[in-house]
Amino acid sequence: MSEKLYPVLPEAKKNTLIDNETYLEWYEESVSDPDGFWAKHGRRIDWFKPFTKVKNTDFNGDVTIKWYEDGVTNVSYNCIDRHLKSRGDKVAIIWEGDNPYIDKKITYRELYENVCRMANVLKKHGVKKGDRVTIYLPMIPEAAYAMLACARIGAVHSVVFAGFSPEALAGRIVDCESTFVITADEGVRGGKPVALKENTDTAIDIAAKQYVMVNKVLVVRRTGGKVSWGRGRDLWYHQEVASVEPHCEPEPMNAEDPLFILYTSGSTGKPKGVLHTTGGYLVYASMTHQYVFDYHDGEIYWCTADVGWVTGHSYIVYGPLANGATTLMFEGVPNFPDQGRFWEVVDKHHVNIFYTAPTALRALMGAGDEFVTRSSRSTLRLLGSVGEPINPEAWEWYYNVVGDQKCPIVDTWWQTENGGILITPLPGATDLKPGSATRPFFGVKPVLVDNEGNVQECVADGNLCISDSWPGQMRTVYGDHKRFIETYFSTYKGMYFSGDGCRRDEDGYYWITGRVDDVLNISGHRLGTAEIESALVSHHSVSEAAVVGYPHPIKGQGIYCYVTLMTGADAQDPDELRKELVQHVRKEIGPIATPDKIQFAPGLPKTRSGKIMRRILRKIAEDEFGALGDTSTLADRGVVDDLIENRQNKK
């Protein structure tokens, strides 16, 4: 735990939008008079019909969350049309390809035409307001066009990360009954092609077996690679957009009409479709983008996330574009052609604000400082971190080496469910402590609760809950409101439970300590242990599996799998079987879920009632088996001795 304090930099204080006095004043107003505060800030976006109701939320009973519910607007209009008069020729998106010699600049006027054309293609093929459109694209401008085109006509987009497998894609198509998919022939990552169209074809076949029929597939030509073609179903994007008008009227949308579904891992079963709506989400995404990054007009802003994750939704596309910013989209990876790529892009495009994940920073830190110091990075003014808690060592490296001690770091905590940043420093207002997300954003009321539900005051450790709503909050789990209530509002009554543990220090700063449920945070991305376990058990050699996390020097958490084999399967070569299981999990979920350690075991530690004692598995995976705690309920102590003897993570 770092106790170092970095006071607000004089340079950051000079031109800041929010100083400490303003922060304290606004925060007080936001929690004592949320209606008044959010009415004022709700007007930061344009409304076709202004709202008269601001907040209508209840975390008890059936849980209702409504913001600006009688207002009418359109997200695409707010991200594009309203900027055309004053900044039509300003660059909206800088696209930096995987290949360092390929890039593209798209102005707001060009963005308008591209989005309108894609919107008209969707309409031409029968997509209507409320229909779900699945987007399975690499990090190319067409991914942003597709999202904004859906928003323009009132279709609900479900973006699936292009690194997910056909099986994972199919599950998401089936869950939201999507009949229109937008994909590319291939993606390119680190110089290697990714077979997106082939994956899409496989996913559509899987979905059809579950009675969800995809009627149309719009295919962007990215590489020109060979693809199979479904006559009457598959459409080339470049041919389709050439045949439609570059103008499309934005659909008037109620503030509570759905904007998008984004699937995220839970502690049980299949991923859940997080549903975000229109008005409150855009108010919150744009407001957090402006104040957390202290964004000033004319600055170049780069968030390195993928649009397949919520960070890409809120802080590559919707937040920056609603603010008329220039946002950079990066197709590549941090280590191609080498580990200096990020900093070369910063110099090439004169990036002022840079937002990335601790896992990338740890990997780059390990590669050595010379990859950083050979670039100038002189345009950088602000650094950000997202996806998982940043360890103080990586924070210090980021501050000293990347930022040359002249850039504040905003270490932001939030989740897919939150729509935008909840706990964060503000660069001109907050003294920084390496490893701490510091203080809540306006309107956010964090509460620490012990396992019995008692609220902890002052300096404390506990489960992180939020006691009142904010405009960017998810409204439900798509098609399963009961699961929404059970997951987030049943553990601690009347509060949203984040699933994270947290410590509050003597200065009121918050330190996120990691998940307290069965969800792993791998390289800043959430994966449910249940998801990985069911992938393992679907292999014919596996009888039972349990998955836990363990500390990993680069990824934050690694994936440790305990596997019990079917009778007879143990005759196989264990190393070969390990490789086979790794490939099997990658096929079922995607490379992001690649197991780091697989331990074969004759049995798993269970209570007499048959419950797996995960606490013990975690301790063994962490090589901390000396303090297993109370094992009196164990049905068979011998199982634990075997696990300790054969552990895969011996230090």
From Swiss-Prot:
Q: Where does ATP bind?
A: 387-389, 411-416, 500, 515, 526
Q: Does the keyword Transport apply?
A: no
Q: What is its EC number?
A: 6.2.1.1
- One GO BP annotation here? acetyl-CoA biosynthetic process from acetate
What top-level branch of life does the organism fall under? Bacteria
In its record, the post-translational modification comment is: Acetylated. Deacetylation by the SIR2-homolog deacetylase activates the enzyme.
Q: What would be one Gene Ontology cellular-component term for the protein?
A: cytosol
Provide the binding site for Mg(2+): 537, 539, 542
Q: Write down what this protein is called.
A: Acetyl-coenzyme A synthetase
Gene of this entry: acsA
